[in-house]
Amino acid sequence: MYKLFGKWDLTEVEVADAGIKRYVNLDPVIVPHTSGKHARQQFNKSDITIVERLVNNVMRNAQNTGKKQIALRIVDEAFDIVNSKTKKNPVQVLVEAVSNAGPREEVVRLKYGGISVPKAVDTAPQRRVDHALRNISIGSNQTAFKSKRSAAECLASELIAASNRDAKCFSINRKDGKERVAKAAR
């Protein structure tokens, strides 16, 4: 059986949120690197493991653009830190963080006679996963910028805080803000 980075077993990870279960891929791989095979089809990003999608989002930062080996190392070190702090499988912590950090409602603008009116709509499950991963990586990048803490430490603390639904966490804060605006627009 393959273990992620030679350490973490993906078969013991369970997705509790039924809405995103189809979009969180937990196929066993050693190194999460598919070389962009999903890029030709619109919704094929769901076929990539959730860890590689996190790696790709970490790689989006300005100084890390295109440096997948650096992003893989950051995620690997962050998973080690998560395991040492929580004594849980870090992929399980990642899945819990994604399910907690994905917004369930957002706002669209509708035009009625030249006037734009905000309307609350449910968020698609794949979009929930995308926003959660993006906000987790943005939060860790902002925390690590001009800080003595490493990017791996910041990513680990963001994952742990998001899995615990900590309101101080960037991704949970961003999710709550979106849902608050949507609630006002009902």
Swiss-Prot record:
Annotated GO CC locations: small ribosomal subunit
Keyword annotations from UniProtKB, A to Z: Ribonucleoprotein, Ribosomal protein, RNA-binding, rRNA-binding
InterPro entries: Ribosomal_uS7, Ribosomal_uS7_arc, Ribosomal_uS7_CS, Ribosomal_uS7_dom, Ribosomal_uS7_dom_sf, Ribosomal_uS7_euk/arc
A molecular function (GO) term: structural constituent of ribosome
Secretion signal span: none
Coiled coil: none
GO BP terms in the entry: translation
Pfam families (UniProt xref): Ribosomal_S7
Domain of life (superkingdom): Archaea
Subunit and interaction comment: Part of the 30S ribosomal subunit.
PANTHER family for this protein: RIBOSOMAL PROTEIN S7
UniProt record similarity statement: Belongs to the universal ribosomal protein uS7 family.
Protein task: One of the primary rRNA binding proteins, it binds directly to 16S rRNA where it nucleates assembly of the head domain of the 30S subunit. Is located at the subunit interface close to the decoding center.
NCBIfam families, A to Z: PRK04027.1 (NF003106), uS7_euk_arch (TIGR01028)
The protein's name in its UniProt record: Small ribosomal subunit protein uS7
Organism: Methanococcoides burtonii (strain DSM 6242 / NBRC 107633 / OCM 468 / ACE-M)
